[in-house]
Regions:
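Catalytic Tyr-X3-Lys helix of short-chain dehydrogenase/reductase
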Residues: 13, 18-26, 31
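Active-site helix of classical SDR
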Residues: 10
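Non-catalytic terminal and boundary segments that flank Rossmann-like NAD(P)-dependent oxidoreductase
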Residues: 118-130
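SDR active-site lid
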Residues: 27-96
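Residues that scaffold the ATP/ADP-binding catalytic core of kinase and kinase-like folds
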Residues: 43-47, 110, 122
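Active-site loop immediately N-terminal to the catalytic Tyr-X3-Lys motif
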Residues: 1-5
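Short-chain dehydrogenase/reductase
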Residues: 97-112
Length: 130
């Protein structure tokens, strides 16, 4: 996500770590799963402390990106739906290393696997950093 490089990188790192750890400990009957939740409608959006330092230099793209993320969060899944999904995964004996909540995010994850990196970047940029 533009202007969220650390956030995006940390999510990628957690997923990679989870997959590697699952591979290391699965011979001992231990499974590790990352649950990719997508947007969740919580009080986080209203509590966000915004800073758009550099917005003028980027032609308003930072504030547009934050605004789009807020819209996504406000239309996200409820915490109850996510909690039920996580509980269902936790009860499984054998789970995939990465589980994705919601049909929308499953489709997006699939598209990320098949689209070239440059095209993915252009699509995400057109949504979040016009």
């Amino acid at each position: 996500i533009p202007f969220q490089a650390f956030y995006s990188a940390s999510k990628a790192a957690v997923s990679s770590y989870s997959c590697a750890l699952d591979n290391e400990v699965s011979p001992y009957g231990v499974r590790v799963t990352t649950v990719e939740l997508g947007d969740i409608h919580t009080g986080f959006t209203q509590a966000r402390q915004k800073t758009v330092l550099g917005d003028d230099e980027y032609g308003g793209r930072i504030s547009h990106s934050v605004s789009q993320m807020e819209k996504d969060e406000l239309s996200g899944m409820s915490p109850e739906v996510i909690g039920t999904y996580i509980a269902r995964i936790a009860q499984k004996k054998n789970c995939a290393p990465i589980c994705v909540a919601g049909v929308k995010y499953k489709i997006l994850r699939f598209l990320c696997k098949i689209l070239p990196c440059t095209l993915r970047g252009k699509i995400v940029g057109s949504i979040y950093a016009k």
